[in-house]
Amino acid sequence: MKLALIILAIVLTIIALVLIIGALLPRSHVASRQIILHRSAEEIYQTVRDFSAAPTWRSDLKRVEMIPTTDNHIQFREHGRHGAITYDLVEDQPGVRMVTRIADLNLGYSGTWTFAFTKEATGTRVQITEAGEVSNVLFRFMSRFVFGQSSTIEKYLIALGKKFGEDVSPQP
């Protein structure tokens, strides 16, 4: 009985520490990674912009659903291993820049991804910058100390490289 109480006290202390540390971390963060692909900016942009085809090259997606809107803006829902997330396309400059924003309000996190496509001598620099906000203190702790705030960007860029037959290593 005494051992069980000690174990319970340790577990509760760990949970309390995780929540306290999460609460002390800033809600907002910015993370950015980039790669160079030996393709044109237009070709890469077309691949990234074709949201419904993303499951053919992103293993984290089961399907993407394009959502009809009344005001002609682009909205889509990605269905992955951890559920569904709805996004809005908020800026679209073909071959140059694209911004998507999480449209769901109840996830415990929100933010934008800004895609920049810059022509280089040997191809195109693809940079993704995440401006995120994590309201859930547990998610905040996990994203900072367990997953890493740039891990989703890195996985995305690696998958994009593989789509074009290139082995890439995302850099800050």
Predicted regions span which residues?
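Hydrophobic ligand-binding cavity/cleft-lining segments
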Residues: K2-P68
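Short beta-edge strand/loop motif at the mouth of beta-sheet-based domains
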Residues: S52-T86, G95-R97
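Hydrophobic pocket/interface hotspot
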Residues: E43-V48, A54, F76, L89, ...
